[in-house]
């Protein structure tokens, strides 16, 4: 595995790759969810590139940028064992410059839900992903469905900017107890982790209600709120695949999303129906 630290080094390494290239952008603290993306990339492509970069522009003031878990040596070992071809580990000053040309999230879809509670977050996400795409020039890029709104906005950016990149959505990976894997799960105490399971429990309950023929969103939302009453819920949302609000469940087109605080840790999860 080759490890590079600057865009120039990565571009030089990329030129030598003859064949399809899969790309898995991450913020590090790699877990089984990230590994599932890497495995998909290796399955689909001749080469796989992974980036580990805690992107400062997607954190709001007062968020956890400084304490976000950084495990660079462990991440290197994980990528090497997974068969990654190139690992890109840049510093912010190699990615960003002063007074940059900016990529902005669309107002209607980028400033609702996650974008409402974290205004400007998706500006930072799209800015860095756009840069990474231009450096890596991947054939395909892999993103988890857990960050569903991010996935949608990246797909839209690729479409709107006529990028010749296939975005591959990948299923949410969960622990045996149902908790969606997240690098932020390390913040949870044992008691908080048990509470966090209420999020996936509420989504499973919603899915069962839909399977039983209940399509009324208010009824499903009320049931979910009852399950989540011990958490500080920011939103429970029902949207279609293009992140338009729904008035009624549409089978095969619905995403139910939850964002909630468990103690001081903010978690998100969703289910695609």
Swiss-Prot record:
A GO molecular function held by the record: pantoate-beta-alanine ligase activity
Keyword field: ATP-binding, Cytoplasm, Ligase, Nucleotide-binding, Pantothenate biosynthesis
Positions with a binding annotation for ATP: 27-34, 144-147, 173, 181-184
EC number: 6.3.2.1
Subcellular location: Cytoplasm
Residues forming the catalytic site: 34
Major location (coarse): cytoplasm
Family: Belongs to the pantothenate synthetase family.
Role noted for this protein: Catalyzes the condensation of pantoate with beta-alanine in an ATP-dependent reaction via a pantoyl-adenylate intermediate.
HAMAP family for this protein: PanC
A Pfam family recorded for this sequence: Pantoate_ligase
One GO term (biological process): pantothenate biosynthetic process
Protein name, per record: Pantothenate synthetase
Leftover remarks: The reaction proceeds by a bi uni uni bi ping pong mechanism.
Signal sequence region: none
Organism taxonomic ancestry: Bacteria, Pseudomonadati, Campylobacterota, Epsilonproteobacteria, Nautiliales
Top enzyme class: ligase
